[in-house]
Amino acid sequence: SGIHHRFEFLSAPNLHWPDTIFSFDHGTGILYTCDAFGLHYCSDDVFDADPGAIAPDFRFYYDCLMGPNARSVLQALKRMDGLPEINTIAVGHGPLLRHHLSHWISDYREWSGQRSKGESYAAVCYLSQYGFSDRISQAIAHGIGKADAQVQLVDLRATDPQELTALIGDAKA
């Protein structure tokens, strides 16, 4: 029954989508992350029993979908730090992460730290009422990325003021 379930919602903008929200179930310790921590991998295993088997796909998924918004990943990880113990991460793609949580979280923290530390990047800010501005901003970010430049998408409605100040202040373009 739902009596023992209490959900806490964490804003995690730009973890593939500008409106991403994590949902933590205090009753079960499950964190539902939408696309974050996901991977395009299919097997009969429901859980991450063999980390070696899924690690390459986990990294590829991060590099393609999460890495371009490494600073947003770091902000989401900070928000996760305020949660009680997480015993499972339920992702939108791939196996449930349960057996090696500290490993997967550490990978995200390390990779995002490397990508965001001292690198020059362009900040592409947008405010989308009907979904058109976010699509054009993603196209602009994709074009910037084709020039081997780093880019950070910034949803002005979903980014807290301190994070916005830091993102824009550190941006080179």
Name the predicted role of every residue range.
Residues 101-173:
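N-terminal beta1-alpha1-beta2 submodule of the flavodoxin-like/Rossmannoid cofactor-binding fold
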